[in-house]
Amino acid sequence: MVKTANSAYDNFIKNSVDLDSEQTGIARNSRDWLYGNLKNFPKVVENFPKLYAGKEIIGFGSFRRRTKIRPLDDIDLMLVFTGEGTTYTEYADKIVLNVPGDADKLRKLVNDDGTLNSIRVIEKIKSSLSIIPQYKKAEIHRRQEATTLELSTYDWVFDIVPAFITSENAYGKSYYIIPDGSGNWKKTDPRIDNERATETNQKFDGNVLGLIRVIKYWNTNRSKKISSYLMENIVLDYFQNKFYWNGMKQELRGFFEYLKTSIYNSHYDPKGIQGDLNTLDYNTKLSISNQASGCFENIDLAIRYESLGQHKEAIECWKKVFGDEFPSHED
């Protein structure tokens, strides 16, 4: 129970949205410990393909970008292999990796035509994970793009994605090649997502990641949801043409006003790979727009009530936005 809108909001963020700082520290240590074990696989696992020296492990996803919200359930990482002369052929709907005859360990994971089977690479990682201390189980991720490792000592799992790095093209650009879930491969580049989130956050004095997290919390409790990745990019698009920070509550109000209309618009993949990320159907867009409109009105009221010292009324407005997890007013 709380007495002011500020204390209610701070309590809500600390106890319902942001990861516990102690748990986050443990998670980072567990991640770094796992990195060390995985880097050693080519030495201790029979026929395990060679890793890319100096770039063996790449962190990505919301934990890496510090936009993860409670509960901490997974940590994403890429296990980057050396191509050993492997080349790729890009088609409209897939990428095929062509493994040379002298890449002995990779050749054990190819199709009959000599192309690398991404599911076999994932299976190789999965079968190798049992040597990890505290191993509990490993499974192929439901989309067949990663191996999910569960350790006996932690509540979170690790999603391990095999990857290769391309050579730079004529424009000095390189990509990561990862499984597409069908045995072939696709392009990605988590460096761009990481850099965009970091640079935008720094531009607004370290406040943007916190706003992303609270919006993601709001999104998870909607009947009509936006994918987490799309939502992050909509928030970053909101800040694209802004020049200063108005305060968290004011920016939440501004974001929901923006979301009312921007949910109908295109939001493009900053990596330039997937095109328009906003593939929601019209009814979903309409539902989200209506919800955003209601949130804008309630936050606007909450700010007005707080300015008048009417904290109980302000808190009730915030509860309409974020639900019962938002603390109640203490008389």
UniProtKB/Swiss-Prot annotation:
<keyword id="KW-0808">Transferase</keyword>
<dbReference type="GO" id="GO:0051607">
    <property type="term" value="P:defense response to virus"/>
</dbReference>
<comment type="function">
    <text>Cyclic nucleotide synthase (second messenger synthase) of a CBASS antivirus system. CBASS (cyclic oligonucleotide-based antiphage signaling system) provides immunity against bacteriophage. The CD-NTase protein synthesizes cyclic nucleotides in response to infection; these serve as specific second messenger signals. The signals activate a diverse range of effectors, leading to bacterial cell death and thus abortive phage infection. A type I-B CBASS system.</text>
</comment>
<keyword id="KW-0547">Nucleotide-binding</keyword>
<dbReference type="InterPro" id="IPR043519">
    <property type="entry name" value="NT_sf"/>
</dbReference>
<protein>
    <recommendedName>
        <fullName>Probable cyclic nucleotide synthase IK1_05630</fullName>
        <ecNumber>2.7.7.-</ecNumber>
    </recommendedName>
</protein>
<keyword id="KW-0067">ATP-binding</keyword>
<comment type="function">
    <text>Probably a cyclic nucleotide synthase that makes second messenger nucleotide which activates a CBASS antiviral defense system.</text>
</comment>
<keyword id="KW-0051">Antiviral defense</keyword>
<comment type="similarity">
    <text>Belongs to the CD-NTase family. D12 subfamily.</text>
</comment>
<keyword id="KW-0546">Nucleotide metabolism</keyword>
<dbReference type="GO" id="GO:0005524">
    <property type="term" value="F:ATP binding"/>
</dbReference>
<dbReference type="GO" id="GO:0009117">
    <property type="term" value="P:nucleotide metabolic process"/>
</dbReference>
<dbReference type="GO" id="GO:0016779">
    <property type="term" value="F:nucleotidyltransferase activity"/>
</dbReference>
<keyword id="KW-0548">Nucleotidyltransferase</keyword>
